[in-house]
Amino acid sequence: MPRRRVVAKREVLPDPKFGSSTLAKFMNHVMISGKKSTAEKIVYGALDIVSEKLNKDPLETFSEALENISPLVEVKSRRVGGATYQVPVEVRPARRTALAMRWLVEYSRNRGEKSMAQRLAGELIDAAQSKGGAVKKREDVHRMAEANKAFSHFRF
């Protein structure tokens, strides 16, 4: 950790189509090797597929999916007297959304559909309906925290 001043968070400019900064941040998670236009095509394509399939506002579905994936607690390793304990800690809001986005992209890439836009759309729809790989990951993280509840007095 820096001993000097805390570096200010940089604001992400909102995306051009929907005007959502959360969506712009998500595009940055989808982006590989700085190819932002490709990431934009993928995300917008996925949102088009979502709106086509569900006949709902795609941004609403996106935020619903993120809400269903966002973890509330996670475990952190803490070394106490030669033993390492998995200590459950609450996840702060910024990290919560970052983890949700990361998991959404990760489990989208592992899906079997043909294009990345289709994979992402499928994972978004599944996450909005509380199923799919990313939601399972969140449940695993919560289960891990619940199992290690006894060590919660080892605060950081």
UniProtKB/Swiss-Prot annotation:
Keyword tRNA processing: no
GO cellular component: small ribosomal subunit
Gene3D superfamilies: Ribosomal protein S7 domain
GO biological process, alphabetically ordered: translation
Keywords: Ribonucleoprotein, Ribosomal protein, RNA-binding, rRNA-binding, tRNA-binding
Single annotated GO MF: rRNA binding
Pfam families xrefs: Ribosomal_S7
Transmembrane segments: none
Summary of the function given for this chain in its UniProt record: One of the primary rRNA binding proteins, it binds directly to 16S rRNA where it nucleates assembly of the head domain of the 30S subunit. Is located at the subunit interface close to the decoding center, probably blocks exit of the E-site tRNA.
Family that this chain belongs to: Belongs to the universal ribosomal protein uS7 family.
Complex formation: Part of the 30S ribosomal subunit. Contacts proteins S9 and S11.
Protein's recorded name: Small ribosomal subunit protein uS7
Organism: Saccharophagus degradans (strain 2-40 / ATCC 43961 / DSM 17024)
Gene name for this UniProt entry: rpsG
